[in-house]
Structures are given as C-alpha cells and as structure tokens.
C-alpha cells in the first residue's frame, strides 16, 4: 500500500493502482449505478486526448517542461491504446459535475507518467495530477469537451449501423416488389399496395434520420476548452484556448472550434438536448417499424400473417409450438429506454444553475447508453430479423381480392354512391367486390380487370373523362 493525502486527510492506496486518493473517495461516495467508467472506453480515450492537447499547449507556452510533457503524452497514448481501462472505476453517475471522472484520468495519467520518468506511483512532486496533468484546465471545460468528442465519435458508429439496416430494408423492398397486399389505416382495410412499398417506406423514413443525427452531432464540434472554471479563463494564459483547441483538432482529426463566448458555453447543455432529441426520434421510428413487423407477422392462423419473421426461440413455457417475435419486442424495449434517457437529458439540462450545469454526468451516461443500445438493437434487428423475413405472397393477394377496401379502386369508374352500395352489399352477403360489380353489370370484366391490375392500384393512373 502507499499513502496519499488530500484536503480531507490521508488514505491508503493499493501499491499497484494507477488511480489515486480522489478516485478512491469517488468509489466510496458514488455506488449508484454499478456501471463504471471503463464500460464506456470512448470517454476514457477522449479524456486522454484532451489531456494530450492541454499538455502540448502548455509546453508551447513554456508552462510545462519538455521532459514532463513527453511523459504525460506517452502516458495518454497508452491510455488511448486501452492499456489502463481497468483503472477507470468511478461510477458514471456522480456528484461534482464530472470532477471524479476528470480526477480519475488525471491520477492514472500522472502515475503512469511518474513510472516513465523513473519514479514511483504517488511521488507527485515530480508529476502532479492537478499541477501538471490538469494544468490550465478545470473539470468544467475538460470533462464536457471529452464527452462531446466521444459522442461525436459514437454518432459515426450509430449512423454506420443505421445505414446497414436501411440497406437490409431496401433489399427486402426489391425482393417483395411484386407482392400485392392490403394497406391499412386505423387497422381497417384501406387500399392495395405492395409489400415492397411497405419496406421501401421503412428504408426512407430511417434514411431521414442520418442527416438529422449528423446535423445535431456537429453541435459537439464547438467546445469550451480554455474556459476553466466558469468561462472567464482564470488560471490559463492568453491564447491558450486557441492553442489547445487547435491541438485537439489535430489529435482527434476533427474540426473543433472554440466557443465565441466561453461563459455561455460552460453553462449551456443545448447541444446534448438537441442530439438526444434526434436519437429519440430514431428510437421512435424503429419502435413503430417493430410494431408493424409484429402485427404483420401475427398469427400464424388467426392473425394478419402477411410476413414470417425468422423463428429465434420457443415462445412459451406452457403453449407448445408457439414462437414469438422476440427480436422486434427487444427493439421496442430499447426504444422505450432511449425515450426515457431523452427525458433524463432534458430534465438534467433544465436543472442547471448559474455558471455551470452540475448534472452533465447523467447527461453523458444517458447519451452513451442510448448510442450503444441503439447500435446493438439495430444490428440485432437486421441480422436476426429483417434479413430473414419471408412473405406469404398468395395469402397477401387473397386478402386484397377478398377485401371490401378493393372498392376504392373502382370508385372513380362507378361513382361514390354505387361504390358505397357495393361495399355494403359485400359486407352483408360475404360476396366479393369483384363478383358484385360484375353481377350488377357496373363494369365489364375486361375493364374491371384493368382497374384491379396491381400496377394500377399501387400507383397513380390516368383517369377517364367519366371518372
């Protein structure tokens, strides 16, 4: 064991631990979610990138000796390589606006830098977590900047997975292009369409979300490095904000910009609110699609049964032979969680006071969780459901021609009153719309067949003068 001290006194730290006393206190204070920082390595790596950029800027300004800078930069590089993930053990939800997370990073980097300099862990007179690793910084600029970088990177993975799901939907749209089915509004028979049109609509609605996610993720490119505590830049040199932002842009390969007003930027969480809203919107659309898949596959004998979902597992402990739509159900539940996370982000953002929002840890946790869950859910939906969907083509077609909704297609040719009468008679007698129209002599068979041609019913067509 080694002894470390802080404002509150001394504590024993395991000799082999790279974290220090402030991390230890955070572990003891915040046993909240059981979800530790190492489960979101993207935030760890972003923090190390921030510390690298700060060290470079401080070296450039003559505030950090080159030997110390080199040790800190190498330690950060090892953190980014994932060598110390297990040392990042603070809870994702914590008081202090992210100070515990920031200090966890400062201590790990400082202790590794000490080893590289030939010193023992805890010999902070040679490389100090606050005086050197956190030089010219505050949690209030370093932490939100790291969160933004990590979320921006996470958005790339999210949209990449979304692209794959869109492609899978579009492939099914082509596969099912010739399958006629009944469209429905308010769960009642409406007018015919193709099953391919159904899946193409899914592809298009999801495609819209790529642009919206990317637009809102771009808000993360404005950062407040150099703001330090509240945005006034106390304890940083003139020009530091510009230097550290330039270095961080180079390190991350991202075009970051310094906020025009650092006081405003330090207290504002609007970018998180906007991005969370776009993530929620994607979740809502995915859930609606999964509702449709469950409904269209209902049955197999007493439901709609237009499509078959791949059977994944036995569905009941009491009903033999039952197979449930477990993959869409899981995606529905993911969407519910993401929608709840969006509300958390909204409430936490609203609760900010004066010059700082102290609730950024739960905002970050919610958004990282939403990104990860949606990535996993979309991959699961694509691989274990959508790609294996098959159609019951004959059943789909039979339902169209047995549906009273078919009367809408002949409405322009026979008139609304006659069409209404046909619908009422079909409902009362059980006869088909097709047979009743021929029986009443309203149209010739040739004309009726032309109107009820799948191409005519599923796309706009030229109407005759009498129509």
Where are these regions (language model features)?
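Conserved, well-structured ligand/cofactor-binding cores
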Residues: 1-467
């Amino acid at each position: 064991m080694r002894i470390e001290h802080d404002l509150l006194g001394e504590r024993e730290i395991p000799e082999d631990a790279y974290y220090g006393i402030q991390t230890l206190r955070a572990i003891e204070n915040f046993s909240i979610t059981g979800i530790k920082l190492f489960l979101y390595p993207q935030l760890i790596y972003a923090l190390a990138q921030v510390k690298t950029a700060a060290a470079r800027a401080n070296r450039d300004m003559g505030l950090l000796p080159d030997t110390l800078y080199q040790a800190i930069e190498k330690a950060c590089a090892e953190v980014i390589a994932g060598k110390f993930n297990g040392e990042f053990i603070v809870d994702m939800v914590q008081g202090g606006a992210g100070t515990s997370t920031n200090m966890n990073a400062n201590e790990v980097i400082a202790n590794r830098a000490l080893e590289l300099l030939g010193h023992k862990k805890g010999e902070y007179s040679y490389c100090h977590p606050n005086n050197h690793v956190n030089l010219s910084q505050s949690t209030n600029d370093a932490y939100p900047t790291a969160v933004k970088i990590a979320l921006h990177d996470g958005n790339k993975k999210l949209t990449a997975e979304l692209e794959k799901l869109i492609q899978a939907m579009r492939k099914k749209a082509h596969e099912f292009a010739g399958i006629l089915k009944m469209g429905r509004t308010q769960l009642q028979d409406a007018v015919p369409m193709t099953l391919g049109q159904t899946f193409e609509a899914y592809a298009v609605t999801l495609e819209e979300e790529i642009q919206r996610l990317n637009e809102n993720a771009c808000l993360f490119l404005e950062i407040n490095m150099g703001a330090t505590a509240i945005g006034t830049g106390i304890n940083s040199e003139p020009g530091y904000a510009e230097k550290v932002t330039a270095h961080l842009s180079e390190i991350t390969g991202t075009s970051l910009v310094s906020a025009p007003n650092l006081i405003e930027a330090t207290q504002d969480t609007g970018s998180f609110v906007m991005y969370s809203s776009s993530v929620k919107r994607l979740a809502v659309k995915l859930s609606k699609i999964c509702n449709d898949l469950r409904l269209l596959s209902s049955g197999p004998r007493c439901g709609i049964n237009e499509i078959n979902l791949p059977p994944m597992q036995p569905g009941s402990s009491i009903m033999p032979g039952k197979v449930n739509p477990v993959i869409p159900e899981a995606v529905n539940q993911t969407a519910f969680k993401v929608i709840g996370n969006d509300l958390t982000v909204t409430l936490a953002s609203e609760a900010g006071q004066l010059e700082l929002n102290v609730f950024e840890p739960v905002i970050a946790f919610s958004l990282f969780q939403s990104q990860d869950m949606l990535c996993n859910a979309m991959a699961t939906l694509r691989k274990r459901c959508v790609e294996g969907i098959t159609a019951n083509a004959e059943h789909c077609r039979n339902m169209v021609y047995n549906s009273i909704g078919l009367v809408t297609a002949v409405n322009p040719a026979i008139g609304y009153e006659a069409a209404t009468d046909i619908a009422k008679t079909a409902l009362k007698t059980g006869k088909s719309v097709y047979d009743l129209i021929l029986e009443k002599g309203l149209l010739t068979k040739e004309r009726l067949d032309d109107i009820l041609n799948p191409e005519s019913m599923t796309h706009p067509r030229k109407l005759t003068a009498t129509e």
